Amino acid sequence: MWKTVVVCFAMLVRAGTCFAAGSAAADLTDTETRWLKGAWPVIAFAKSQAIPLDIVVQPQSAPGIAPISLAYISGRCKLVLSMRGNVEARATLERIEPDLLAATLELMAAHELGHCRRYLDGAWNGLPAGFVAAALPDDINPALRLSYSDMKATRREEGYADLVALAWTQQHHPSLYPRVHAWLLAERSKDLIPGSHHDTLVWVQLAKDATTLVQSSTFASSTALWAAGLALDN
């Protein structure tokens, strides 16, 4: 199942290999090359917008890690591929219908770009003006309250990133939007634990109609609908 994570700094320091177009391409595996090719329209967009985005290919074995994720280090976003020794990287590609693969890989890359945008805006884990996070349930073990609060904040960020991904699809693959949306909805519904980190259904369901994401930019479209989802979620 596709789940994204925010990669820790220490992991990248231990074994991160930066990749630039035209360099070290021969060292990439076929799986890494396919993911990068699929993500490239989003990467090119980030470059055109002067978004500080680097690509990091993890050379070590990474079983059980999300194949694609994001880190934020020293003011720069890192799009991280963790695919070696990771059966999920290839399995994810094989589960997607061939004619939907390009659009779906862009969706996943755009999701990570959504995380990047929030970091660059200094808004990570923040709420829009006028919103206050719902109070924690009284019956939560005091030792778990901070973890619960962090989980809720992560869930909000995942919801925003999913909307950025869908807004990208609406703008770049409008004819495929219903199918890509259905794919994402199915992914978020698998093994769902309500209220957990990747329970973004409130936002994904709001975006079933592609016209809800028609705005001047990918990020503007996402922000408006994200706020609507926050209101429902609270």
Region locations from a protein language model:
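Sec-dependent N-terminal signal peptides
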Residues: 5-13
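Post-HEXXH active-site segment of zinc metalloproteases
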Residues: 119-158
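Long, well-structured alpha-helical subdomains associated
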Residues: 147-158, 163-234
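Second-shell loop/turn segments in exported
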Residues: 27-33, 67, 92-104, 146-155
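Active-site scaffold of zinc-dependent metalloenzymes
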Residues: 67-103, 109, 113, 119
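Zn2+-dependent metallopeptidase catalytic core
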Residues: 29-54
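N-terminal signal peptide c-region/cleavage motif recognized by signal peptidases
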Residues: 15-21
